[in-house]
């Protein structure tokens, strides 16, 4: 149960982030400072911008939630994110900075013409907006749990916090806020891990899992009958199936390489080396946070039961195991751990940190959407805006509109539907950006614009069709294959023309 001490901790974290957001605004004098930090950001600001967005609700609350049911396989989100950052730093950083553009769609537009850029900008913005929407939903849920307010009020509070986080300082705000959030997140993760370790180490948790789930009514409602099945489900990186779990990791890798926000951090670096180090630092620091979430999720599995599980056990005429904390749903795993097992002040700080984790993801992504809309769509029509104070005002205003629109959509759409759209978001981003950008960087001038436009349309169309038809596998990979085939056809066609 929330207490006054919990609220003091939450408010302290929110006040700290608000201060960082307004302080970072002093470093912004033009649109370049806002969108790419004026190319003056150091290693930690680059890393903070990347991690501030990547380490969102899925990396923390979502990891603990998945670990509650599937143990180690919950690591794929943060593991895939880390590998994506590794490739971003080792392979993409220098080519992106040397491209002469400040957006991924700008890279595509320069190589394949303005029409390819326009089409890609619209589709990519839609994909990123869906992710912003998901983060607003998560933040609203957290706020409605922490504070006794209605969902609409919680939604408005969430976007106000996001605005403080990024709208004043842009990349500086996302980067500085990301560094602060990283420090807080590591602190609460380490403390959470220590608490779990002191109460029950790994061997004891495995033993408790076997006792709770092997040949028991609770195990039966989860499809587990033997201790071997329990160990396989909780101590296996591919517990949900190799195609699903490894596919999830690959989706994250492609998503990191195909999202404006993370590339924006690369352009913000003061040099190629700084940008590379920032991405590599992110690659090193993201996966351990997932491990802490896994420990907490497995620990809570041995101490909690969901309302749905209680109902299923009672419906089967069995006795509900005593001494377990009831959770309304598995999304409450991490918050429940904080409230029940952490000291109150530390628990409040942790809840505030989790809220900011979700907020940081939404604010960073909204910055990416705004940059694409202004620099890749509006300024292509009104070039006089480029480099003016009006450009900065326009980017800030676009961020505010994106956040407001996300609240409106959230209030008019069921959350389950929004969660399903999360998969579509990742697919849209990667299918639009990944292959065309790679070809623009490494095969520049060797593929005609008509082929690029075809690939940019065919890729996301495949993702949309796959989601509508509910394919049993991730349609993203088919779409990547379609894009690759189209671009390779363009490469062959270009070679034939030049050889004639």
Language-model segments: what does each one mean?
Residues 1-23, 449-500:
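A generic transmembrane alpha-helix motif of multi-pass inner-membrane proteins
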Residues 1-60, 166-169, 188, 192:
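Membrane-interface "cap" regions at the ends of multi-pass membrane proteins
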Residues 2, 39, 45, 62-72, ...:
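Loop-to-helix junctions at membrane interfaces in multi-pass transport proteins
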Residues 2-25, 37, 41, 65-106, ...:
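Extracellular loop-to-transmembrane helix junctions
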Residues 20, 24-27, 129-136, 144, ...:
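Hydrophobic alpha-helical segments and their helix-loop junctions in multi-pass secondary transporters
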Residues 31, 101-105, 109, 170-180, ...:
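Hydrophobic, small-residue-rich membrane helices and short re-entrant helix-turn-helix hairpins
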Residues 75-169, 251-255, 356-363:
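Helix-loop-helix module between adjacent transmembrane segments
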Residues 114-118, 374-414:
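Loop-to-transmembrane helix boundary motifs in multi-pass membrane proteins
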């Amino acid at each position: 149960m929330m207490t006054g001490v919990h609220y003091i901790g939450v408010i302290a974290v929110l006040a700290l982030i608000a201060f960082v957001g307004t302080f970072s605004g002093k470093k912004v004098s033009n649109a370049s400072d806002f969108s790419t930090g004026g190319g003056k950001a150091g290693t930690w600001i680059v890393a903070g911008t990347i991690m501030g967005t990547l380490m969102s609700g899925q990396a923390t609350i979502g990891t603990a939630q998945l670990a509650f049911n599937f143990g180690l396989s919950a690591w794929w989100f943060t593991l895939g994110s880390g590998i994506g950052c590794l490739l971003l730093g080792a392979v993409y950083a220098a080519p992106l900075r040397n491209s002469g553009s400040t957006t991924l769609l700008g890279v595509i537009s320069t190589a394949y013409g303005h029409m390819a850029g326009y089409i890609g900008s619209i589709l990519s913005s839609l994909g990123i907006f869906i992710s912003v929407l998901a983060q607003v939903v998560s933040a609203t849920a957290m706020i409605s749990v922490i504070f006794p307010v209605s969902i609409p009020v919680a939604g408005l509070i969430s976007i106000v916090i996001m605005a403080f986080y990024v709208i004043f300082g842009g990349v500086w705000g996302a980067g500085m806020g990301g560094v602060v959030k990283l420090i807080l997140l590591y602190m609460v993760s380490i403390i959470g891990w220590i608490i779990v370790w002191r109460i029950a180490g790994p061997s004891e948790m495995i033993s408790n899992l076997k006792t709770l789930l092997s040949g028991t009514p609770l195990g039966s409602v989860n499809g587990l009958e033997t201790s071997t099945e329990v160990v396989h489900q909780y101590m296996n990186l591919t517990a949900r199936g190799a195609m699903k779990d490894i596919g999830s990791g690959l989706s994250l890798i492609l998503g990191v390489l195909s999202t404006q926000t993370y590339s924006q951090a690369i352009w913000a670096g003061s040099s190629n080396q700084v940008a590379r180090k920032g991405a590599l630092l992110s690659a090193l620091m993201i996966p351990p946070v997932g491990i802490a979430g896994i420990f907490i999720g497995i620990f809570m599995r041995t101490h909690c039961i969901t309302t749905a599980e209680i109902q299923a056990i009672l419906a089967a005429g069995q006795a509900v195991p005593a001494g377990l904390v009831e959770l309304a749903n598995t999304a409450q795993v991490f918050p429940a751990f904080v409230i029940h097992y952490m000291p109150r002040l530390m628990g409040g700080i942790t809840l505030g940190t989790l809220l900011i984790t979700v907020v940081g993801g939404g604010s960073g992504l909204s910055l990416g959407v705004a940059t694409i809309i202004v620099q890749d769509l509006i300024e292509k029509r009104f070039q006089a805006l480029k480099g003016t104070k009006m450009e900065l005002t326009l980017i800030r205003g676009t961020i505010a509109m994106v956040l407001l629109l996300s609240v409106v959509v959230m209030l008019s759409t069921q959350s389950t539907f929004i969660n399903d759209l999360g998969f579509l978001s990742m697919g849209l981003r990667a299918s639009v950006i990944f292959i065309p950008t790679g070809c623009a960087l490494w095969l520049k001038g060797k593929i005609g614009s008509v082929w690029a436009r075809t690939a940019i349309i065919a890729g996301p169309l495949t993702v949309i069709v796959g989601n509508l038809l509910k394919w049993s596998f991730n349609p993203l990979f088919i779409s990547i294959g379609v894009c690759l085939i189209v671009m390779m056809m363009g490469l062959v066609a270009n070679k034939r023309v030049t050889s004639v």
